Amino acid sequence: MGDMANNSVAYGGVKNSLKEANHDGDFGITLADVRALMELRSTDALRKIQESYGDVYGICTRLKTSPVEGLSGNPADIERREAVFGKNFIPPKKPKTFLQLVWEALQDVTLIILEIAAIVSLGLSFYQPPEGDNALCGEVSVGEEEGEGETGWIEGAAILLSVVCVVLVTAFNDWSKEKQFRGLQSRIEQEQKFTVIRGGQVIQIPVADITVGDIAQVKYGDLLPADGILIQGNDLKIDESSLTGESDHVKKSLDKDPLLLSGTHVMEGSGRMVVTAVGINSQTGIIFTLLGAGGEEEEKKDEKKKEKKNKKQDGAIENRNKAKAQDGAAMEMQPLKSEEGGDGDEKDKKKANLPKKEKSVLQGKLTKLAVQIGKAGLLMSAITVIILVLYFVIDTFWVQKRPWLAECTPIYIQYFVKFFIIGVTVLVVAVPEGLPLAVTISLAYSVKKMMKDNNLVRHLDACETMGNATAICSDKTGTLTMNRMTVVQAYINEKHYKKIPEPEAIPPNILSYLVTGISVNCAYTSKILPPEKEGGLPRHVGNKTECALLGLLLDLKRDYQDVRNEIPEEALYKVYTFNSVRKSMSTVLKNSDGSYRIFSKGASEIILKKCFKILSANGEAKVFRPRDRDDIVKTVIEPMASEGLRTICLAFRDFPAGEPEPEWDNENDIVTGLTCIAVVGIEDPVRPEVPDAIKKCQRAGITVRMVTGDNINTARAIATKCGILHPGEDFLCLEGKDFNRRIRNEKGEIEQERIDKIWPKLRVLARSSPTDKHTLVKGIIDSTVSDQRQVVAVTGDGTNDGPALKKADVGFAMGIAGTDVAKEASDIILTDDNFTSIVKAVMWGRNVYDSISKFLQFQLTVNVVAVIVAFTGACITQDSPLKAVQMLWVNLIMDTLASLALATEPPTESLLLRKPYGRNKPLISRTMMKNILGHAFYQLVVVFTLLFAGEKFFDIDSGRNAPLHAPPSEHYTIVFNTFVLMQLFNEINARKIHGERNVFEGIFNNAIFCTIVLGTFVVQIIIVQFGGKPFSCSELSIEQWLWSIFLGMGTLLWGQLISTIPTSRLKFLKEAGHGTQKEEIPEEELAEDVEEIDHAERELRRGQILWFRGLNRIQTQIRVVNAFRSSLYEGLEKPESRSSIHNFMTHPEFRIEDSEPHIPLIDDTDAEDDAPTKRNCSPPPSPNKNNNAVDSGIYLTIEMNKSATSSSPGSPLHSLETSL
């Protein structure tokens, strides 16, 4: 100890001279030395430090830093260090270029078919049959005699052009989406700070500013941002599984294993380290470089590997890769992650770490709906083509009895190509490729706006899942309460003080114990700083409960800092840090005479049980019997708790000098036989806005439960203040022990039936451990008591909340109080730790659902009308009234633009006035079905009237039966124009889906909507007036325009008529877009794990499932082999630590499946058996191994189906899984 003090003193003297002398950055240790040192482990590292540098302080001296004061913080010095040792930043993978996104958008099957048809049409249009044979080829050539032949190429060219438009729009959408995510990443990066000592001051700096030589303070729950060597530690335990795959926590100490590695988690204790490697030179950085985060060669290898893989896997993965717009090396790494990343982990952790299946209800429903609509569209388009071809063949060769002439063949083919294009056009309009786009836009827009409501969304689909939430399990401290704690009552020298006593009232020796005990037995990182603003409240830094105790000392006019200066942190002999199992903290001091004194603080009932004495009124210790303890509980602790106070007991124990050295590792023998100093009551007031927010939740059909570590009386009092409990209601409040007793059988196993008896009535779970929280969440999610599977949101802030946060449908981590580990496991980070922000998330989630429904209502109306018009028109008049190019324009309005317009509606409070939709609620309600069919009826009547009687009404030439390549007719232009205007006005109707009357309500709050509607109208005018031949349009007069607009506006009036008809009367209406019902699932599947099977998967029969299991198994083996091969090429990378937020955030390749430390990312645990890189061979305890295999297998089919039915490539539904 003294040695260290001298060291720092000596250092302080030379510090400045060293800095001046070495202005060229000539440190006593090179980057290569540091890297080599950090790659060693435990004893090797110690040996190397001792041989080369003497000790840690030797390294500090060479790095020109003081172990006590830290760096000076001088900008020139920091710059020099960054130049020599690098910055703490890992360069992200280059984003996809716009051209790459364009190429991806071109992969769409429908677009490819159209391109081929257009090229064939182009080629054939240049063929002229020999003169004289014209008459023999039938009416084909009528148009050509009028000199129209040379314009035949225009249609083909126009189709190509519109395909280009669609591709550009899709690519632009993807590009802006990727840009947005990158912005979000950098935001998360900037928010992550770490505590370092600079110039003797403890400050927080952004992780990217940490540099080699910094002295960093590490504490429980931190995620280490750089590599370092321990200078001083208290009971420090690190989870290194993200780097080594070993799940046991590693104990770090100066004499055994002082190396701390970036990307690992501090699970217990605290300490200080000197930073030795940052950025790409840290262990995490080295692995990232191996994985090709920066390397060009790796990218090329990836390309090759991907090509091979795509061939082998039938292109199915190609789609998945597309979906994950920022994939990169993630695919290659998946097997490595799962094999080497933390196998034999504890059971509950393992379960929590299996990827969450059936994450997004909406995706499942939409996939199913899109596939159904796609199939119908394919059928319609096929029938259309067959009818057209048959009609033409019969008419030409049968009725007109024409011979087949060789020179007429190209003209006949031209006809067939025209029919084919009409068929494809029907398909283009029928396939709702805008659905995935609408979902993505809606979610991306919501995510952006949710930032303002203090929700930082890390996984897109969490936002939508929140709309379905039926239960919220919330922490108490900081979420429901203000987390500004103050001691308001105390039991000292056998008196219960209702307010803090004057220091004179307390015997001096008791006061002395109190001051020393609180000062040294609170983490040295906890302190009270002066207010930022004049007249404001003092700032509490660190653990808020400890700050309350330090505040008590200030109220007693004593300064804790004096004690800490006298006993610096290094002088503490042993520290038993606080964790959720101990629920207490103890610190041992060694006195000059060789005796020891231990101070303990913790939950009052836990510490009091260990007290055998108590300090009496005169300051002497007297015997403390169980009877006395019960008295204190009844007269002091329970009254405090019933007022909502958290009770903390402070105690101490002396170990005399003469006795043999205590066995310090045997904590139970050390922390016992204590003497009680005092019991204090700490108040943490309820946030004023919480009761109202909870009322909103209850009105919205969401049950709020409180899970807390506090004692049951405190918890009950706070729950009543918040409105979670109402006096006189029959709800349960349980303690963790009681809860466990009720849900376990004689063997101590948890039984679902027992949980099912408890959770519906449970409102408060007190004195609970993180395991209890996980058990409760799992129990509610797995329960089958209610018709609907519960959707559970959970808040968490501690390191051990990880499993519960992962198990929940949506995990909320605290942005302020939360540890990095909790943030890693979460889906959404609450930047203000406030419960009301969760209510906002519910609102946004429901809004996403409604936005998608609005879009569906609009899109399906257009689909129905366009398909029927194209089909009937083609069958009756041999030509689609809406040409291919016009259909593509309609498709653009209806897909891309409408999804933008309708998916960006802001949410309103009224969303909280209804119950959650539930998992099986159909996407298209009966009211929506009524609207869709009603509007489709109106539009079809208008279009067919114009088609078959329009020429008489407007007194123009009929456009029906026009020959090939005839010029565009006014007649068909009016049909097209009216059709588009009806869609435009119907877009306004689509804004309301619950049968509201006023469709204009709040329309001006949505600027995007207004811009798109007006913009579309302007473009429509340009197309009709100046589009000419390419768009098959001829100019219209003012009168014709007015008629078109009038018929378009008719949809608004018609909408009012429809909303007057009560839906309940229309018994024949069916809902659509269901989640899947139970009877559709084979029984074995249900038995495996009912709710873990994805909606879209349930359609598949058992045979298919087995078949895909086989396929998937092969696919996985290929994937593992490839990964293994790549790992050999790339210098046998170690499994990377994706677990650090700042790294994870800089790397798009890890954005996809999120950076959960030990998740087997191959979707099935089966695969791990084949994995050559596997370390521990114990099979993971998965509740449903087979199911996982089914899972990925079927994922595959849906992707195939989807690609077959043309989903717009840049945004297949799975792009939603892009983690933020």
Swiss-Prot record:
Catalytic activities: Ca(2+)(in) + ATP + H2O = Ca(2+)(out) + ADP + phosphate + H(+)
Entry-annotated residues carrying Phosphoserine: S8, S17, S338, S1140, S1155, S1178, S1182
Stretches for region Disordered: 297-356, 1160-1220
Annotated spans, Calmodulin-binding subdomain A: 1100-1117
Active site: D475 (4-aspartylphosphate intermediate)
Enzyme class name: translocase
Protein family: Belongs to the cation transport ATPase (P-type) (TC 3.A.3) family. Type IIB subfamily.
Protein name from the UniProt record: Plasma membrane calcium-transporting ATPase 1
